[in-house]
Regions:
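Detector for C-terminal structural segments
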Residues: 174, 216-221, 294-305, 331-367, ...
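Aromatic-rich, solvent-exposed beta-strand/loop patch
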Residues: 110, 168-186, 201-255, 281-304, ...
Length: 559
């Protein structure tokens, strides 16, 4: 592993420092105020940020800031294609088990006191070996350790030389490149992790378009432009364009909205019941009063919202539950109007899930191949009769557990199901408690979301593979079907994309037919920016990409 910087990089830094000395300025002193004319992108994170260590970047709250600071071997473009990042190219062996990555030689870690002279060094293949082994180390306790479960660690990962990395798999996995786009797979310097220890997440050192500047917890987090960032635009200009990123931590959503309207925030993400009708028309268009001031971005989001049934009859609590009856589960699927729900509760942001579990935006999504459920109260009543509950007589009340964010959706479903003879009780739980109860099979009927970890249908269909039962895996319904498992395993070993998509669609249809879930809607990314913000755009993973963003006017909020 080499720790020396290139002459070109050293000289580029030496000249500005010399100029500052000539001007009589303290080169090492941080100015109290930023230079005039700085462009700062400002957004709010209402849930707070616990760490900036990519090893723990599990939620969108953490992924967004981590994405500005770190890079991996590969990255995803806005069309979900895997593109080079630190790796400039790669090869995959014929058997699909050996990946060889050829790295750029112009990628440097951010300047930090952990390096000799405080100057960031060049990234090597050995840094990726260290970063991957750190994620796999049980002592790290990274929630992303599962990514590398299929690695043949007897052979690698292996740094062949400074710019060549080999990764060996136990068995082929066609979605592996997509996995490597996850922020868990970011490269980190051993020196910084060892120097800061458990505090590395509060003193991050990465390679990204921005570097860490300052963090006042609960108040403000500042990133500054990485002037040595390796990526350039189509015209050869070095990215990023912005000078800084400022993240605030306003917890109240209405206050956040007001700050955005006043121009103190550049970006607002998602819908809040408190302001959706102010920003959007019922049809999902921008409120005309904001025309010329605010831009609305929407596109399919790889997120399926659903209700899940615990169908594992080996569990005593499930054995006497009416949801073990497939006809009851299907009646629930037919018993409410998804289209009406989306219009009145989501302002048509999102698409009614009238097909399978796979969302719009994935290649395997096929409304022509996978038939789902549409509102049909007569069919729901018929299924109840066939299940032995005519008009719902004798059917015990079913408890649906959710968090408060989805109370309105669940109450809508509750009301409509009552009209076909199905009585639903709604139980509201807090986020952490709710997730724990779902993972540990304590809820018979629950609301769920599945946001893609990586853009491959396998990531969704793994939720119904019998070897993935929670709490060890993501199969929260404990659905089990030998035929489904066989299709899933065949898909994992199929390199041909067209054949694999066909297998995925067969599995998706099986889930609809067996009904361990109630698909609600396929979500949409919804973003609001002021018109002076350019090039933000959106993507199906709802990743916040700021390296291309430009602002027309200037800010001074980057201290």
């Amino acid at each position: 592993m080499h720790y020396l910087c290139s002459k070109q990089k050293s000289m580029r830094r030496f000249l500005p420092a010399l100029l500052l000395l000539v001007m009589g300025l303290g080169a090492c002193k941080t100015p109290e105020k930023p230079e005039p004319g700085m462009t700062v992108f400002r957004y709010n994170e209402s849930k707070g940020i616990a760490t900036l260590d990519p090893a723990y970047a599990k939620s969108q709250t953490l992924i967004w800031p981590v994405h500005q600071l770190f890079n991996g071997l590969v990255q995803m473009d806005s069309a979900l294609n895997v593109q080079p990042s630190v790796a400039r190219r790669w090869e995959i062996s014929d058997d699909g088990r050996v990946y060889t990555f050829h790295l750029r030689d112009d990628v440097y870690f951010h300047d930090s006191r952990v390096f000799p002279g405080g100057e960031g060094r060049r990234v090597t293949a050995g840094d990726f070996v260290y970063s991957m082994e750190r994620i796999m180390d049980p002592a790290t306790a990274s929630p992303g350790a599962w990514i590398f479960n299929n690695l043949d660690t007897t052979r690698g990962p292996k740094a062949v030389n400074d710019t060549t990395l080999k990764i060996y798999l136990k068995k082929r996995f066609p979605a592996f490149l997509g996995l490597l786009t996850m922020k868990y797979c970011s490269v980190v310097p051993r020196e910084a992790v060892e120097y800061y220890g458990d505090e590395f997440g509060h003193h991050p050192v990465g390679t990204g378009p921005f570097h860490f500047k300052m963090w006042r917890e609960g108040e403000k987090l500042i990133f500054r432009k990485n002037t040595d960032y390796f990526e350039r635009d189509a015209g050869g200009n070095r990215l990023p364009y912005l000078d800084a990123v400022a993240i605030s931590f306003i917890t109240d959503k209405q206050s956040e909205f007001l700050e955005f309207i006043k121009g103190n925030l550049d970006f607002l993400s998602g819908l809040s019941p408190a302001n959706k009708d102010e920003l959007l028309t019922r049809s999902g268009q921008l409120n005309p009063k904001y025309k010329g001031e605010i831009k609305l971005y929407t596109q399919p989001y790889l997120n399926t919202e659903y209700l899940g049934f615990l169908v594992d009859t080996s569990l005593e609590k499930v054995q006497n539950s009416p949801v073990t009856n497939r006809k009851v589960r299907k009646a629930i699927n037919y018993g409410f109007d998804r289209k009406k729900m989306m219009k009145y509760l989501r302002n048509n942001i999102g698409t009614p899930a009238n097909h399978g579990f796979l969302p719009k935006g994935l290649p395997a999504f096929s409304p022509d191949s996978v038939g789902g459920y549409r509102y049909n109260p007569d069919r729901a009543r018929q299924l109840l009769r066939e299940a032995g509950y005519p008009n719902g007589e004798g059917l015990q009340e079913i408890t649906l557990t959710t968090t408060d964010d989805y109370r309105d959706l669940c109450e809508f479903i509750q009301h409509q199901l009552s009209e076909v003879g199905i009585d639903i009780a709604i139980e509201i739980s807090t986020g952490a408690t709710f997730r724990d109860m779902v993972a540990n099979s304590r809820l018979l009927f629950f609301r769920g979301s599945w946001i893609a970890d990586y853009p491959d249908s396998e990531n969704y269909l793994a939720l119904f593979y019998s070897r993935n039962f929670s709490p060890g895996g993501p199969n929260y319904t404990h659905f089990s079907n030998p035929r489904y498992d066989s299709l899933y395993e065949t898909a994992l070993n199929t390199m041909d994309p067209a054949r694999r998509q066909n297998l995925y669609r067969q599995m998706d249809q099986m889930i609809i037919d067996h009904a361990p879930i109630v698909p609600l809607y396929y979500d949409q990314v919804v973003r609001f920016t002021h018109t002076h913000v350019k090039n933000l755009g959106s993507n199906p993973m709802n990743l916040l990409v700021l390296k291309h963003v430009k602002k027309k006017h200037h800010d001074t909020d980057s201290r």
